[in-house]
Amino acid sequence: MKQKFYDTAVKQERAVLVGVITQGETDEQAKEYLEELEFLVSTAGAETVKSFTQKLQRPDRATFVGSGRLEDIKAYVTAEEIDMVVFDDELTPSQLRNIENELQVKILDRNNLILDIFAGRAQTAQAKSQVELAQLQYLLPRLTRLWTHLERQKGGIGMRGPGESQIETDRRLILNKISLLKDRLKSIDRQNETQRKNRHQMVRVALVGYTNVGKSTIMNMLSKSEVFAENKLFATLDTTVRKVVIENVPFLLSDTVGFIRKLPHQLVECFKSTLDEVREADILVHVVDISHPNFEDQIHTVQETLKEIGAIDKKVITVFNKIDAFKPELHSIEEQAEPITLHDFKDSWMAKNNSPAIFISATKKENIDAFRALIYNEVKVVHTDRYPYDHLLY
């Protein structure tokens, strides 16, 4: 009798992406936004098989896209046996319910997807509590469309963390859990605040930037330690702090979660304690991926997030990373314009901005000595101001 073998591998979920091109958005921007959403889906562990877009003044109140476009999506999802549809925006509870009723597959919005990735990345008790709190706050207004009890975990993307709840009877359970998590995080915050006070005398430098720009690689290079660095969105979730010494001047360098366009407000709120490393830093090192076609949009996103957490007025060193991957043909102001070279951008940026900036490649070790010298000079200014009698160090 022949022995039968069964494939026990978990089937990779297949996803369709949906985006709306609103007034003021270009086709190129919409394409870039969906590419980022595809990267998010890949980071979560699924495969994107098709994208749908529609030009609208604003998303449809009932179904996000128009009824005709929704029919197109439904036909494709049914014919290709798609597992889930992901929308590049936050859906209202009613939109989510209406779309689910129409498509009869798993529906995720951008916020749910990002929260799910955070749930998969969280390692420490603090990060896990922060993510769970954000997920429950996202879940609470959406209780009426959920079908699984809170304690019954359902697998797959969008289902990690606290799971899903059945109906209003679970509202009290979720509210109690939210209260418990807030108390737990307050206790962790007090411990973290004590730790920060203990190291307050040292100059503190925080790496900030859009997700996947190379912050952790720079952290490893400067601190000569191994911090997890990967070509995935949100590879770093928990804050890492290392002591660094350049030319006899010591300082603390922290690497924390990367920012992203449309970062869920639940996450910004719940991660405020983690972002205290940024808020309380003396100097911010803003890392930019200059090889990215829309790096200037990413700069704007980071600046808006810094403003939201109360850190916009900090001293900033801008580090344009990945110069080895810069391609002039991807950077032009208008369709017919000449491509912008790296030299052109350096000249224009330096002319417009007074804050210090430098262009490097962390992976290829290009211009690293100048980068270290720039950090040294900026840290020395703060250090000298704090310790005026330490001048013999220099």
Stretches found by the model and what they are:
Residues 1-17, 38, 137, 141-213, ...:
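C-terminal-of-GTPase-core extension/linker across diverse P-loop GTPases
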Residues 1-110, 114:
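N-terminal accessory targeting/assembly segments
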Residues 111-115, 233-234, 363:
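Short, acidic/turn-prone active-site loops that include or flank metal/cofactor-
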Residues 112-131:
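Short alpha-helix plus adjacent loop in nuclease-associated cores
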